[in-house]
Amino acid sequence: MVLSPADKSNVKAAWGKVGGHAGEYGAEALERMFLSFPTTKTYFPHFDLSHGSAQVKGHGKKVADALTLAVGHVDDMPNALSALSDLHAHKLRVDPVNFKLLSHCLLVTLAAHLPAEFTPAVHASLDKFLASVSTVLTSKYR
């Protein structure tokens, strides 16, 4: 999915508003995903998935850091996320549908925390951005 200049601007501005809360929002999105889509828990059998667990917070920070990297390299996400794509495709073997589920939960989390900034245009841009990230992360599954 191609991001327009307006989409890129919206994504960078919205992610800039996330600021120091990125890890917190990443963890919240994971918790939402685990509650809304319980089958996603199967990829984390060794995690304490209870609310506020250190493992969920730690993985939420990893998710947020990867998204920060993608925002910073929005014009070259395939190269920036190559190692992460390899990891998910070849080692973790995560079902690609789970990226869509997490993307949805991220959008809900961002909308809850940034209601003034979460305009329809920003929502659409973030949705396109997360779809692009998902496409990159699943590109090595073939």
From Swiss-Prot:
Tissues expressed in: Red blood cells.
Annotated residues for binding of O2: 59
Domain Globin: 2-142
Pfam families recorded: Globin
GO cellular component: blood microparticle; haptoglobin-hemoglobin complex; hemoglobin complex
Keyword flag Heme: yes
SUPFAM superfamilies with a match to the protein in the record: Globin-like
Cysteine pairs bridged by disulfides in the record: none
GO biological process, any: hydrogen peroxide catabolic process
One Gene Ontology molecular-function label: oxygen carrier activity
Binding site for heme b: 88
InterPro entries: Globin (IPR000971), Globin-like_sf (IPR009050), Globin/Proto (IPR012292), Hemoglobin_a-typ (IPR002338), Hemoglobin_oxygen_transport (IPR050056), Hemoglobin_pi (IPR002339)
Superkingdom of origin: Eukaryota
Modified residues (N6-acetyllysine): 17
Post-translational modification N6-succinyllysine, affected residues: 8, 12, 17, 41
Positions bearing Phosphotyrosine: 25
PTM-bearing positions, type Phosphoserine: 4, 36, 50, 103, 125, 132, 139
Modified positions (Phosphothreonine) in chain numbering: 109, 135, 138
Keywords: Acetylation, Heme, Iron, Metal-binding, Oxygen transport, Phosphoprotein, Transport
Protein family (similarity comment): Belongs to the globin family.
SUBUNIT field: Heterotetramer of two alpha chains and two beta chains.
Role, per record: Involved in oxygen transport from the lung to the various peripheral tissues.
This protein's name: Hemoglobin subunit alpha
Protein's organism: Macaca fuscata fuscata
Gene name tied to this protein: HBA
